[in-house]
Amino acid sequence: MFDELLFFSDNRPVKRFWFIALVGIFCAQSLFTLADDSLKSLLPVFGKPLKAAKLPKAALPKAQVELGRVLYHEKRLSRDNSIACNSCHDTVGYGVDGKKFSLGFEGHLTGRNSPTSFNAFMHLAQFWDGRAPTVEEQAKGPILAGGEMAMPSAEAVVEKLGKIDGYEALFKKAFPKSKPAINYDNVGKAIGAYERLFVTPGRFDKLLAGKNKALKENEIRGLKKFITTGCVACHTGNLLGGNSYQKLGVINPWPNQKDQGRFDLTKKEADKMFFKVPSLRNIAKTGPYFHDGSETKLEAA
């Protein structure tokens, strides 16, 4: 039930992680095997299998990834030098911090649960409300958010980085055509380049690739149930989510009505309580669940 994967992280080029395959968590009724044609016919809804990311060989993107790695772990990107991207999206914690709400500047609690940064660049958009189109744009948001890293302005970020030994050289190497090399857009571009290595393939992908013994029998039963009960209507594609917005509280009103989801961004009545559907990759390790962290147990979620 556990798969080994390779993942680029921290101060080492490669770090090993173990994660629980999504499909192993679900219960089911009757026995199905991969010889079952009905199951095989349903698998195309998940698309092509994920493939592990590789460090770029070309000098320029490699330099951008290296700069992004440093910036991702740089606490001095926060106003009080205490919070980095990695604080809430921990690369040794499956891209999350495991908290209902993350701690921001001066102990402020963020209003939403921190989603995993793993595989995030493949989502249709970033943040629970989709307000950033790419991980490069997303990376620039929390740094300036008052309740998160709380830097007063993009200019203040650039000035601060310019005074730290080593950054001038790293930025010039990563962005040789930029004048000046240290600018706020390049901060986002570098962090995004690093995050684009956060790909976590596993046994489920072996199944999608046609390897009949990739999953155990109970996992196959769970997958069959997952598909036939309609979970796949929202959690679809090879990320099992991350590619649509859906409404919470369709049958009964969602208990937390303070956060109106995409409505707070678009001001469109039709967007009330719509949130991005999270990916179920590594889901057993990325709780608590939902945008408000309201459920701690996966079975209940």
Outline where the language-model segments fall.
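Short glycine/threonine-rich turn/loop motifs
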Residues: 36-141, 203-301
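Central I-helix of cytochrome P450 enzymes
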Residues: 147
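Post-cleavage N-terminal segment of exported redox proteins
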Residues: 2-8, 13-65, 123, 141, ...
